[in-house]
Amino acid sequence: MELIVIIITLAFCILLYGTRWRAALDPREPRLISPTVPLIGHILGIATDGFGYFSKLNDKYGLPAFSLQMPLSRLYVITSSELVPAIQRQSQNIRFDTFEFTLAAERVGGVSGPGLKLLKGSIVDELQHAMHHALIGHGLDAMNLSMIEAIKPSIDELQSQKQAAFDLFAWCKRSITMASTDSVYGPMNPFRSIEVERAFWDFASNMNMIILNVLPFLTARKSLDDRRKVVDALTEYYNLGGHENSSEMTYGRWEVQYNKGITTQDIARMEIVNAIGVLSNTAPSTFWTLFEIYSRPSLLRDLRQELVASAVYTHPGTDGGIVRTIDLSAVRAKCSLLLGTFQEVLRMRSNAIVTRMVHEDTILNERVLFKKGSVIVIPARCVNREKSVWGETGDSFDAYRYLGQGKSGTSRSGRNVTRVAFQSFGTAPNICPGRHFASGEILAVVAMVILRFDMEPVLGEWIPPKANVKTLASSIQTPAGEFMVTLRERKEFKDDKWDFRVTEGDSKFPLLVG
């Protein structure tokens, strides 16, 4: 959700703070980078390259922080982890604002009028509390159990492919959507409808004009229609009482809003924002993890050996055959290479942007001034690859760099990796609350797929598909098109049956967070 918020913040900071930036740059502020095209150059850069534009500027200038002058406003872009702890310590002056929450509700969900007024004040904290509480302990355990039951049939169906080519990313989207939404929304899950699922993904991939509010009734008519279809389905879901037999998270969010007098339709509109957070990162993360593993035969071999040795338990089935069970608790506790591979995917493929508003003039590390009314952005793509932290291989994928990591993290070369140099889940105190659920789902899929199947790209080479740099919904790079593959069942496990095992109370993953 935070990636959506930064887009909205960029769109509205001009209106909110524009007149304050006509003054000259204070010499203590980060260096001002002038656009190649006066006034609109930076806007054109973001429109063309997405948030990769910040990375391009970082590569060109190599500054720990810099300022961008928009037509009427200024942004501070932080590219070095050195400044992140100082920002965290100034959480009273530099913070994630509640107004950004209401802007997301208005632009993404379409909440308006009285409903928008109700989404202010204490309700923001209450909704966040409901989500955080539901995504740890019993609530997380229940969602994990439901997710496992829903994801296994999708993996079993891959056996029927029999070397027929299929789009790997489309499969990830469909499988993750069904498993995630079944666990979140329960038996009456509205996303089981193919029409609703398709409308959601079409909307999530084409929100630009809606968020920027550029005559959306003309420029984004299809996106508005897609949103309406999802809102109608969610409204019916609540009217029929689907939330009464759903996850603790879904019921908790509904209860907070219902008790505040928010209408069912506006609750449904707010749920679109939540659904984007649930789905838009998990599917591409699953795709890239499978891609990076299968494109590296030696890594694939090592991961298979690790899983078989540490997390797969074999026992006879009722029909006399063999059942192989993957224990997800063992994956968390014993499969450090698989966790490292996943973490490296997040490090290298992150499109996340941390955003903060500055409420008072603030000097960081006794030398850098951030002025009141400014917007701070921290692109994970820059911080996650910082060579002063990650070493000269910071721009390269290395799944082995986390082996033997300590509390802060130590790379294979012994280099200390501080948590603030990993921004894929955001930065404290606003860390992604759903990271443990998403991680469990992704690693369950990846573990079973790589153990059961060999996979080859139709084109013969593992050439990374182009990323859709303009998608606003995902904090992970999303493939811009199809990626066709074929697979076959591994001979050593042919005709074996597979299952998962989940241990309640043991659902948190030891991943780096900022």
UniProtKB/Swiss-Prot annotation:
Q: What EC number is given for this enzyme?
A: 1.-.-.-
Give a yes or no for keyword Heme in this entry: yes
**InterPro entries recorded for this chain?**
CYP450_monoxygenase_sec-met, Cyt_P450, Cyt_P450_E_grp-IV, Cyt_P450_sf
Q: In which organism is this protein found? A: Hypoxylon pulicicidum
Q: What is this protein called?
A: Cytochrome P450 monooxygenase nodJ
Give me the residues that bind heme, please. Answer: 432
Question: What top-level branch of life does the organism fall under?
Answer: Eukaryota
What are the recorded GO MF terms, alphabetically?
Answer: heme binding; iron ion binding; monooxygenase activity; oxidoreductase activity, acting on paired donors, with incorporation or reduction of molecular oxygen
Main enzyme class: oxidoreductase
Q: What is its main location?
A: membrane
Classification of source organism = Eukaryota, Fungi, Dikarya, Ascomycota, Pezizomycotina
Q: What Pfam family is a match for this entry?
A: p450
Q: In which pathway does it act?
A: Secondary metabolite biosynthesis
Cofactor(s) the record lists? heme
User: Where does this one sit in the cell?
Assistant: Membrane
Annotated TM spans: 2-24
Record's keyword terms, sorted: Glycoprotein, Heme, Iron, Membrane, Metal-binding, Monooxygenase, Oxidoreductase, Transmembrane, Transmembrane helix
The terms describing its cellular component in GO are: membrane
Function description: Cytochrome P450 monooxygenase; part of the gene cluster that mediates the biosynthesis of the indole diterpenes nodulisporic acids (NA). Nodulisporic acid A (NAA) and its chemically modified derivatives are of particular significance because of their highly potent insecticidal activity against blood-feeding arthropods and lack of observable adverse effects on mammals, in particular the tremogenicity associated with the paspaline-derived IDTs is not observed.
Which residues carry a glycan? 144, 245, 416
State the family it belongs to. Answer: Belongs to the cytochrome P450 family.
Note the CDD domains from the entry. CYP7_CYP8-like (cd11040)
Q: How does it sit in the membrane?
A: Single-pass membrane protein
